[in-house]
Structures are given as C-alpha cells and as structure tokens.
Amino acid sequence: VGNGPENTLPAMPHLFYAETSVFMLTTLFCLALAVAANAPLKEIANPLVPENPAKAPWYFLGLQELVAHSAFMGGIGIPSIVLVGLGLIPYLDREEEGTGRWFGGPGGLPLVLRSAAFGLAAVLAVEAVAVRFGWIREWWPEAPQILITAVNPGTILTLLYALYSIWTVRRHDSTRAGALALFTCFLCGFLVLTVIGTYFRGPNWDFYWSPADWPAH
C-alpha cells in the first residue's frame, strides 16, 4: 500500500493464514473429487481405428475448437496473441486507482458485467454463424489457404474482443479498464468454446445438440 513503510501492511499472519487456508481447502476438494469420480479410462487405443471424435482433455477443448477452424491460428497464432497480451498488461497498466481491489479502477463491477455480456454474445454469435451457415471453405471451396488461416471464427472473435477493449480504453480513458474488459471477454469466450467442444461436438467434429443424435456406425 503506497511506497513508504507507514503505508504498508505485514503479510504475516493474516495474509499467510488466508492463503494457506485456501490452499488446504483446494487440495481437500481435489482429493475428494478424485475419490468420488472415477477417471474415464477406455479400452487400449487402436491405431488402425482412431477414435471419432478424438477429443483432447477438457481443459484443451476450447483450443481444439479453434484448431478445428484453423490449425495455425487456433494452435499457435491466437494463443501467442493471448499470452503476449496478458504479459503486457502489467507494463501497460501503470494506474494507481483501484490497485489491489476486486474490479478496481474506472468502470468497476458494471464494466465487468457488461464485458461478460459482450464476450458471451460475441462468441455465441460467431459460433452460431459457423455452425448454421458454415464458413469460407463451404462458401468458396477454392479459397486460398492463407484466407482460411487469416479469416476464421477464431480470428474474428479475437478481433471483436480487441476492438471492444480499445473502445473501453477510450471510453473510460483508462488502460486498466481496457485490460479488465479484454480479460473478462477472454474468460467468457474460452468458457463457451470449452463447453461447445465438450458437449456439442461429435464425429468429424460436427455440431450435435446431443450424443443421441450422432450417426450410427
């Protein structure tokens, strides 16, 4: 708090006890979950008959949804942009207002809620268009690969989030507000992509409302 010793607070014992309690409760929850839920182990993989759909662990299914549209942008381009953007936030955000507080800075909680609504609406709209109408490859089979790589649901979604963040920075005249908006959109988008990849993708990575709708082999 501040820069001088008179405006500081000791980490011991209050912060240390709080962090230790959270760590112990998290560990206890993970252990209880591991005991209560069995791992979904299947038969030994057969390289001659690959699984369809072959899905990554659930925490990678958001990325797999992006990779389904473009291997390069989904697997390398967009993750690199996200990591670089998150890494730059501490260097770009030099504001002191709201430091150390949840939803601190201009906008506060209303900004987070508005950003969450935009983030959810954007990813749902982009995915709905891709599922209902297809994308460039379906519209134009002879389209060059560079166009498929540059313009796909993942890049469109990234652009929408970036433009919303820039608009937020200008509206609130605050880099922190833009960073908060961008991070909120990223979390909402990744959550929706993970849910879609987990529950609504079937054979050949086609969209199905339920596994009961999958074609019979």
Stretches found by the model and what they are:
Residues V1-G4, P10-T99, F103-I136, P144-H217:
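Hydrophobic cores of alpha-helical transmembrane segments in multi-pass integral membrane proteins
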